[in-house]
Amino acid sequence: MVYLRSGEGAMRPHVSELVINWHITEACNYKCRYCYAKWDGAGRELLHDWTRVRNLLDELQAFFHPENDANPLSQHMTWSSIRLNLAGGEPLLYHDALLRALEYARSKGMGASIITNGSRLTNDLIDRLAPLVSMLGLSLDSADPSRNIGIGRIDSRGSLLDVDSLSEVLVRAKTQNSALRLKVNTVVNALNHQEDMTPIMHALMPDRWKVLRMLQVVTSDLAVSSEDFLAFVARHDALREVMCVEDNDDMSESYIMVDPLGRFFQNTAGQKGYHYSSPIDVIGAERAFIEWRFSAGTYAARYRDALVVGRE
């Protein structure tokens, strides 16, 4: 069900891009303690079945096409184009399948972007990836190794993200795609809320820095108070030109999200877990969409005039 929340007017807002977030896998080489990428349901992840991937993308492209007046979302907002954002888990664990999906999405007229923890970005991969995406999203919660270890941002071999090497890869990405934009996602939690991330933001120079309060949809581990979250935001006021702040209420029922099994899914404020539709490639996007709750006004407020990829 698509709806406007109380206080949202009748005028249809417009966004340049409608962003569809497909979480292609739950698998990840990190074990972040507050990770929300945990979904119910059994079965093989859709990414590993090319026929189903193609059918899913065909359904999404047709249903969310800006000229599809049958989409109930068009009654509440308008948009000029579609962008497919691939997330995880860690989507680059399956980089060949990811690249194939990106290429197909672009062949259907969709824009493309990804969100990654950065650990699998190599020169060879960035040479293939950068020309396919308009934005590269990077999940980065701390510049401090001990905090990253505490959060769980460390792989099974004990390796942490090398920020210096990452910076070099990002420079290379720009040489492959001069129009590429960088977005950084930071989840404010009990371990990093006192950190000053200004130096690393100056080093990376993102076009957008999304600052999100840890969302208690799967676990309450490392939850942070409203006061501590707002203090983190205030500490980084000098970066307000690129900072986009989202508290928990802003993240409820306001993203277009598809899980690894090809279902629309959504979180609701004050509730644990997710609500799911049936698989989109099985019953079609139109039928699946009506099984699902979505706040068009909150979505439009986030994306209007903003260079963002979505939650990831």
Residue ranges and their predicted role:
Residues 44, 48, 145-265, 269, ...:
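Radical SAM enzyme [4Fe-4S]-AdoMet core and its adjacent flexible, acidic
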Residues 20, 84-86, 112-114, 136-138, ...:
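Hydrophobic faces of well-ordered beta-strands that scaffold small-molecule active sites
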Residues 41, 90, 120, 142, ...:
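Flexible, active-site-proximal loop/turn residues at the rims of small-molecule/cofactor binding pockets
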Residues 125-143, 200-211:
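Structural recognition of alpha->loop->beta junctions
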Residues 55, 59, 96-107, 124, ...:
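Alpha-helical scaffolding segments of alpha/beta enzyme cores, especially the outer helices
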Residues 80-82, 108-110, 132-134, 178-180, ...:
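Short, well-ordered coil/turn segments that N-cap beta-strands
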Residues 3-88, 92-113, 123-127:
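Conserved alpha-helical substructure of the radical SAM core
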Residues 91-92, 116-121, 188-192:
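Short beta->alpha connector loops
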